[in-house]
């Protein structure tokens, strides 16, 4: 199936026997800021308004909001520990693997961007 069809079909909230989905694969690009509870799309649990699969957990969402409101790094760490425990309870996603794309660049190229998509703007030859 082509990716355009996946994108159209994965938003259907019907059961699989009526054209909906209950699982799909995707990737999260390293360049997307998913290193904190705010930027990580995969741990969102805001129900039907959220990402495909529509996980719903008011507690996860409350902890994400509390992390944003935390006054200092120690409080953020405490909230992250609690959030991680809640994520094991509600499990909004399951990572099924990881890959790294082996890439080589010529020595005379600089300013090559990182990420999973090839972009050539800004690259310079020295």
Pin down the residues of each PLM region:
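Phenylalanine-focused residue identity feature
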Residues: 3, 24-25, 54, 93, ...
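Short linear motifs at secondary-structure transitions and domain/linker junctions
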Residues: 2, 70-74, 119
């Amino acid at each position: 199936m082509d990716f355009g069809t996946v994108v159209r079909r994965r938003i259907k909230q019907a059961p699989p026997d009526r054209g909906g989905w209950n699982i799909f694969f995707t990737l999260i690009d390293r360049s997307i800021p998913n290193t904190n509870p705010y930027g990580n799309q995969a741990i969102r649990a805001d129900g039907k308004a959220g990402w495909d699969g529509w996980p719903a957990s008011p507690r996860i969402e409350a902890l994400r909001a509390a992390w944003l409101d935390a006054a200092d790094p120690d409080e953020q760490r405490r909230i992250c520990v609690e959030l991680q425990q809640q994520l094991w309870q509600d499990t909004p996603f399951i990572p099924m693997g990881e890959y790294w794309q082996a890439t080589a660049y010529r020595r005379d190229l600089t300013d090559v961007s990182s990420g999973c998509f090839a972009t050539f703007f800004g690259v310079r030859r020295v």
